[in-house]
């Protein structure tokens, strides 16, 4: 029976060593991030929501890089107002570079005034540029360095989603951000593809 207890002890030690470091400063981002390769259309497939009113589903983002290397983005998606009024709304973001090519300051605002605006950190946690991307932002940190108010998007180039292999990578990144099981699936049902012009703001 001693070997059984030894295995139990090893498992306990392994669990303790594997305890996740949830301080924001410990999170890894994409090495040698390339803005030009990242540009183009991305479909939001899952989202960890922050505080405030943001786009809720049917979210499509378009990233671009100008001749000076500055990145910007536009996004369209559905928002529900007053619990029963669905509208399509646009948001705009501009990015300021930092010393790390995968970490930006993002100034964003809604074309409609009811949407949130701010100037948040915007980190590209991981991407292969052709299939998936995981974005993260911490808007407010606790005293211990963990995040008190964060949001995160999982983006795809294909609105139909990922292969099982990519899903496994994405789940791992979500766990590394201490956000496992905190994302909700983003639907894409064509609500904002031009069929509902009367409800576009």
From Swiss-Prot:
Superkingdom classification of source: Eukaryota
Database matches in InterPro entries: Calycin, Lipocalin_ApoD, Lipocalin_CS, Lipocln_cytosolic_FA-bd_dom, Retinol-bd/Purpurin
Residues binding substrate, per UniProt: 116
Localization, UniProt: Secreted
Main location: secreted
Omega-N-methylarginine modified-residue sites: 139
Keywords in alphabetical order: Disulfide bond, Methylation, Retinol-binding, Secreted, Signal, Transport, Vitamin A
Pfam families tied to this protein: Lipocalin
Quaternary structure annotation from Swiss-Prot or TrEMBL: Interacts with TTR. Interaction with TTR prevents its loss by filtration through the kidney glomeruli. Interacts with STRA6.
Matching PANTHER family: RETINOL-BINDING PROTEIN 4
UniProt name for this protein: Retinol-binding protein 4
Organism: Sus scrofa
Originating gene: RBP4
């Amino acid at each position: 029976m001693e070997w059984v207890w030894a295995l139990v002890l090893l498992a306990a030690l392994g669990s303790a060593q594997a305890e996740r470091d949830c301080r924001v400063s410990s999170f890894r981002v994409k090495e040698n991030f390339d803005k030009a390769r990242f540009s183009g259309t991305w479909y939001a497939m899952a989202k960890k929501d922050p505080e405030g009113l943001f786009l809720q589903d049917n979210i499509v983002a378009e990233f671009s890089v100008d001749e000076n290397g500055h990145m910007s983005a536009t996004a369209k998606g559905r928002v529900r107002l007053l619990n029963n009024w669905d509208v399509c709304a646009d948001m705009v973001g501009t990015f300021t570079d930092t010393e790390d090519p995968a970490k930006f300051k993002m100034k964003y605002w809604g074309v409609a005034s009811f949407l949130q605006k701010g100037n948040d950190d915007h980190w590209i946690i991981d991407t292969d540029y052709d299939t998936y991307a995981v974005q993260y932002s911490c808007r407010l940190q606790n005293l211990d360095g963990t995040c008190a108010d964060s949001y995160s998007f999982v983006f795809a180039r294909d609105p139909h989603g990922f292969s099982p292999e990519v899903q496994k990578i994405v789940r791992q990144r979500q766990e590394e951000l201490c956000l496992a099981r905190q994302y909700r699936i983003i639907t894409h049902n064509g609500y904002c593809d031009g069929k509902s012009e009367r409800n576009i703001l």
